[in-house]
From Swiss-Prot:
Modified residues (Phosphothreonine): 655
Glycosylation (residues): 53, 88, 94, 103, 117, 134, 236, 320, 375
Name of the protein: G-type lectin S-receptor-like serine/threonine-protein kinase At1g61480
Extracellular side: 25-425
Phosphoserine PTM positions: 530, 545, 625, 638, 698, 792
Occurrences of domain PAN (ranges): 333-415
Cleavable signal peptide: 1-24
Binding site for ATP: 502-510, 524
Gene3D superfamilies in UniProt: Bulb-type lectin domain, Phosphorylase Kinase, domain 1, Transferase(Phosphotransferase) domain 1
Subcellular location: Cell membrane
Cytoplasm listed as a keyword: no
Length: 809
């Protein structure tokens, strides 16, 4: 009896200690005091009081729970520490969050009051401290909108020119003083935007302009870079920069008291520094002054652009380059406007684009050159992949030349700076050319007789392709697109032999080929009976030639000859996802980590189409057979014949010609022809469930009632969280919680109402964090009828081929 009483009191003591040191939330009745902490639901972050070096100054802050040494990512009272042990953080009668000292004076507050009968403060697993209305569940205030020196995944920097609102990082004064320091980090309202570290009102470091998935002034961010960032700007004068992180890793971005912008990631044992800027002298803003280039060498050094000389030779010799350079020969622009060329452009490679650029929309590379040439105030231009045309009308400031990467900058110079006496060069070149012509004329004539038939045929083929494009297919800007000759394609594919056939879809066959230079290609040969006409063919060429992302297939060119229409793509070794997923042997090659990587890659590609691409694209035919895999099993979205371009951030339209693949089509699209971004989200949800189960939606039938894949997924999620949906061949390689989360995300994507489905930003957040998910509702397309001879859906028939359905008005 005595032992039982001792155990009872010991248990009671442990419970009391636990309750006294860890809170589920802060309320008016349950404040947070010194010595107690508030943890996020999964124990990722912790909120509490802390001090530096056993100082009496106490701060309320958020840090990573269980990681030593402590990394504080947010401080509430950064300017006003408390010095007494009776301080506490609590909810006031008007719903505000307040920090009181022992005299019950307010030391810090969120600065807002709410017409709320009750509220509480909670800490999310994203590290966001939120004040929530108890009645409506609405978030009244959040720390993610009030930054300190640190940015966590899924928080965002932003600006709004209309309201004047701006969200920035502000450094600490020192590593033991969290009060505001000298440095801030912000995104600029320029188009395109760039990230800048400011020292007071002066720029200290800048990233270079944003190019869809990368900052052009950071050389490690090349075209193959997998970006954890997203930057959105709209026409109303607002923009936001969001930081993601993959695979549930702990990470953060911070600005130090010395002005160093750093990105850290935890490897399970320690923090790794993944990025730092400025890293050397060339990163310091304007290090070489106007029209100077900082050459990224060891040590860094300054030089002037061609056609420019140091403004002060003496200062330049002393190593003081901030005065920069001045033009050696003045420009005379009048001649360029009346047809006589007196100025030209000198091209410099591997350059970080200078500051003070201006964006010219809807201009191709040639147009960019022509506009700058005929504008006397245009000093330079660059046509940048992912941006388009940038021009400079002011001094070229903060230019850096990298050893690799960077952009090509074209600088306007007087013609005399571009290579000496042009007339003498022309005369010499003419004499040499004439001599060579006389010597080679006879040999060329003989050779021409032999080659003329082949050459004429090839030219006719190439001209036919271009004329068909120009006259028949209503040309659009496809700069950089190559027109292949028909005989080149026939040779590469061995005249479209069956041994080179990779597969066949609704719009024709796909063949493997090899060009004369050894490059492997995939050729899509459109069938005349496929139903893909001029519009779809042009659509696919225009779209893919402009879209560039690691998770989208890349088009190399096309061929148009007579009735033949061919598209030439990069060849991907592992073909399409369905060849692995639905093959009993090959499916063993894609374990759960690879499947999750494929899921995430498709989501990133879709996010690029919907939000990060300047065209804004709805795919309309997303399915497993349109997901191609490279040699590393990275997914690439393909087949843009049915895709639609749109402007703005949200889009909805309807069509009389409903084209897509039944089973992957959203209900509103299949029934009424209405499509939007959420139509693609529905298709993604179906693909996600197929990847989890290894089952094809058009072939799946479960139980005596013949349940569809969606019906079975819903039933499994309701009964077991969805873990029994997983393909048994990959069960040993999975994390059960990750699988259950993916099942729930898949069901959220296939909701009947488009408004209930997530957008791509929310989708990426769901896949890459452990934040709470909303519960899905029962999806549509779950009722099957079954007789002895056939199995058919009660609502709609599923077919593997892309279909077109004409709807009445």
């Amino acid at each position: 009896m005595g032992k039982k009483r001792i155990m009872f009191f010991a248990s009671l003591l442990l419970i009391t200690i636990f309750l006294s040191f860890s809170y589920a939330g802060i309320t008016r009745e349950s404040p947070l005091s010194i010595g107690k902490t508030l943890s996020s639901s999964n124990g990722v972050y912790e909120l509490g009081f802390f001090s530096f070096n056993n100082s009496q100054n106490q701060y309320v802050g958020i840090w990573f729970k269980g990681i030593i040494p402590r990394v504080v990512v947010w401080v509430a009272n950064r300017e006003k520490p408390v010095t007494d042990s009776a301080a506490n953080l609590t909810i006031s009668s008007n719903g505000s969050l307040l920090l009181f000292n022992e005299n019950h004076s307010v030391v810090w507050s969120i600065g807002e009051t709410f017409a709320s009968n009750g509220s509480r403060a909670e800490l999310t697993d994203n590290g966001n401290l939120v004040v929530i209305d108890n009645n409506s569940g609405r978030t009244l205030w959040e720390s993610f909108e009030h930054f300190g020196d640190t940015m966590l995944p899924f928080s965002n920097l932003m600006y709004n020119l209309a309201t004047g609102e701006k969200r920035v990082l502000t450094s600490w004064k020192s590593h033991t003083d969290p009060s505001p320091g000298d440095f801030t980090v912000q995104i600029t309202p320029q188009v395109p935007s760039q990230a800048c570290t400011m020292r007071g009102s002066k720029t200290y470091w800048r990233s270079g302009p944003w190019a869809k998935t990368r900052f052009t002034g950071i050389p490690v961010m090349d075209d193959t870079y997998t970006s954890p960032f997203s930057l959105q700007q709209d026409t109303n004068g607002s923009g936001s920069f969001t930081y993601f992180e993959r695979n549930f890793k702990l990470s953060y971005i911070m600005i130090t008291s010395e002005g160093s912008l750093k990105i850290f990631q935890h490897n399970g044992m320690d923090w790794e520094l993944n990025f730092e800027a400025p890293e050397n002298s060339c990163d310091i803003y304007g290090f070489c002054g106007p029209f100077g280039i900082c050459v990224m060498s060891v040590p860094p050094k300054c030089k002037c652009f061609k056609g420019f000389v140091p403004k002060s030779i003496e200062e330049w010799k002393r190593g003081n380059w901030t005065d920069g350079c001045v033009r050696h020969t003045e420009l005379h622009c009048q001649g360029n406007t009346n047809g006589k060329t007196v100025n030209g452009f000198y091209h410099v490679a591997n350059i970080k684009p200078p500051d003070f650029y201006e964006f010219a929309s809807f201009v191709d590379a040639e147009g960019c050159y022509q506009i700058c040439l005929h504008n006397c105030s245009c000093l330079a231009f660059a046509y940048i992949n992912g941006i388009g045309c940038l021009m400079w009308n002011q001094d070229l400031m903060d230019a850096v030349q990298f050893s690799a990467g960077g952009e090509i900058l074209s600088i306007r110079l007087a013609s005399s700076e571009l290579g000496g006496n042009k007339r003498n060069k022309i005369i010499v070149a003419s004499i040499v050319s004439l001599s060579l012509f006389v010597i080679l004329a006879f040999a060329a004539f003989c050779f021409l007789r032999y080659k003329v038939k082949h050459t004429v045929s090839a030219k006719i083929s190439k001209i036919a392709s271009k004329e068909a494009w120009n006259n028949d297919l209503e040309p659009q800007d496809v700069s950089g697109l190559k027109f292949f000759e028909m005989n080149t394609i026939q040779t590469a594919t061995d005249n479209f032999s069956l041994s080179n056939k990779l597969g066949q879809g609704g719009f024709g066959s796909v063949y493997k080929g090899k060009l004369q230079d050894g490059k492997e290609i995939a050729v899509k040969r459109l069938s005349s009976s496929s139903g893909q006409g001029k519009e779809e063919f042009m659509n696919e060429i225009v779209l893919i030639s402009k879209l560039q992302h690691k998770n989208l297939v890349r088009i190399l060119g096309c061929c148009i000859e007579g009735e033949e229409r061919l598209l030439v793509y990069e060849f991907l070794l592992n073909k399409s996802l369905d060849t692995f997923l639905f093959d009993s042997r090959k499916r063993l090659e894609i374990d759960w980590p690879k499947r999750f990587n494929i899921i995430e890659g498709i989501a990133r590609g879709l996010h690029y189409l919907h939000r990060d691409s300047c065209l804004r694209v709805i795919h309309r035919d997303l399915k497993v057979s349109n997901i191609l895999l490279d040699e590393k099993m990275n997914p690439k979205i393909s087949d843009f014949g049915l895709a639609r371009m749109y402007q703005g951030t949200e889009y909805q339209d309807n069509t009389r010609r409903v084209a897509g693949t039944l089973g992957y089509m959203a209900p509103e699209y299949a029934w009424t022809g209405m499509f939007s971004e959420k139509s693609d989200i529905y298709s993604f949800g179906v693909i996600l469930l197929e990847i989890i189960t290894g089952e094809k939606i058009s072939r799946f039938s479960y139980g005596r009632q013949g349940k569809t894949l969606l019906a079975y997924a819903w039933e499994s999620w309701c009964e077991s969280g969805g873990i029994d949906l997983l393909d048994k061949d990959v069960a040993d390689s999975c994390h059960p919680l990750e699988v259950e989360r993916c099942v729930q995300i898949g069901l959220l994507c296939v909701q009947h109402q488009p408004a209930d489905r997530p957008n791509t930003m929310e989708l990426l957040s769901m896949l890459t964090t452990t934040s709470d998910l909303t519960s899905p509702k029962q999806p549509t397309f779950v009722v099957h009828t079954r007789d002895e001879e056939s199995l058919s859906q009660g609502l709609i028939t599923v077919n593997e081929m892309t279909q077109s359905v004409i709807l009445g008005r």
